[in-house]
Amino acid sequence: MTLWINGDWITGQGERRRKTNPVSAEILWQGNDANAAQVAEACQAARAAFPRWARQPFTARQAIVQKFAALLEAHKADLTEVIARETGKPRWEAATEVTAMINKIAISIKAYHARTGEQKSELVDGAATLRHRPHGVLAVFGPYNFPGHLPNGHIVSALLAGNTLIFKPSELTPWTGETVIKLWERAGLPAGVLNLVQGGRETGQALSSLDDLDGLLFTGSASTGYQLHRQLSGQPEKILALEMGGNNPLIIEDVANIDAAVHLTLQSAFITAGQRCTCARRLLVKQGAQVDAFLARLVDVAGRLQPGRWDDDPQSFIGGLISAQAAQHVMEAWRQREALGGRTLLASRKVKEGTSLLTPGIIELTGVADVPDEEVFGPLLNVWRYAHFDEAIRLANNTRFGLSCGLVSTDRAQFEQLLLEARAGIVNWNKPLTGAASTAPFGGVGASGNHRPSAWYAADYCAWPMASLESPELTLPATLSPGLDFSRREAV
């Protein structure tokens, strides 16, 4: 029984599915997808639960969310292992994901009050009050790269605001989704407030096409995000929050400290085996002998990165990709760029056939035409050389995406120029592109999405503002508008 609908665990009636470890092929989870009728049933349960949940005092909703946080802390080691085994990422990184889930809850509670709480302004004859109300029934689509942390950012904020939810994890991480939902169950969520439907494309399409849905919160690829946007077009009454991918540029202008610049580049491009939406995909380096030394050192250090199993001891910096198919896709993208005329600086290599273990690849594309503007979700870094900083910014903006952008430079003026001219939601200076804070907005523009799914800014799309002018009594104004005559006529 792998679906949780209206407080009950039930068996899916859709396609049979199993999840294996992407390196060892060990079977981790087996179950059936939700079919269209079960997806509709989950929505009906959420709709029925909404009025009572929305009317709960905020303190009651907060208490359940805080109990969930305590359960995350108590089961941190278990959830860490589930995430690591299912995604293939090293244990150390899976542990940081669970920590981020825990920390995000306190921040989300503060964000609710700061961004969507109640604000009152006194007027001469009453008050003006701003309140926020939940949308209703929302769908949450989770990604596979951070299957606990990223859906958590949507779910916690939406529940605090008083919404009820249907959660569909990625079909590549059903075990993590189920494990997290079981903690919510133990936290005491009332039946129907949060529902779990497992499945792939068919389940997702059934969920996003429901008429009774008030909105959809999505983290994932641009292609799926665009499909959802088209599906919900012409329905302005539904909230649609999209956090999608990026073809992110990292500009290396000044490499006086070569090892520091190499470390920042490795963290930007290859952490999580390149499976972060903010990862650097394009490395823009200034022409000259200094950058030649930097690239040589980058190739040297990156060439020593050996992806390992989730439980290797000592632990590796990167693990496997989400699947052997994902690793193959990265290899094909590298070969495609070679065929276009790219010069390989570091060749990607499969550590073992049939697994998702893939070493990083670096390829130079200076002067190469017709390079696809796409997000290759894995450890592949494309290099371009530029002559001057204005050209670097032009290259950085030469993408339909607009998620993250970074600059390595000692010149503050260059960073100020980048802030003015970069088309990206995240612009970092001498910091990895993959660095983010839950108290800051996370997201981008263009093909990278619209709203900002972080703990702080998620509050914005989980509730709508209601403005009120209020007075405890009704009185006639002392001064009337022109043309109004309230004088009393004497009876004849």
From Swiss-Prot:
Major enzyme class: oxidoreductase
GO MF term list: succinylglutamate-semialdehyde dehydrogenase activity
Highest taxon of the lineage: Bacteria
Biological processes annotated in GO: arginine catabolic process to glutamate; arginine catabolic process to succinate
Membrane-crossing residue ranges in chain numbering: none
EC number: 1.2.1.71
Keyword annotations from UniProtKB, A to Z: Arginine metabolism, NAD, Oxidoreductase
Pathway recorded for this protein: Amino-acid degradation; L-arginine degradation via AST pathway; L-glutamate and succinate from L-arginine: step 4/5
Binding annotation for NAD(+): G220, S221, A222, S223, T224, G225
Cited PANTHER family: ALDEHYDE DEHYDROGENASE-RELATED
Protein name: N-succinylglutamate 5-semialdehyde dehydrogenase
Species name: Salmonella paratyphi A (strain AKU_12601)
The gene coding this protein: astD
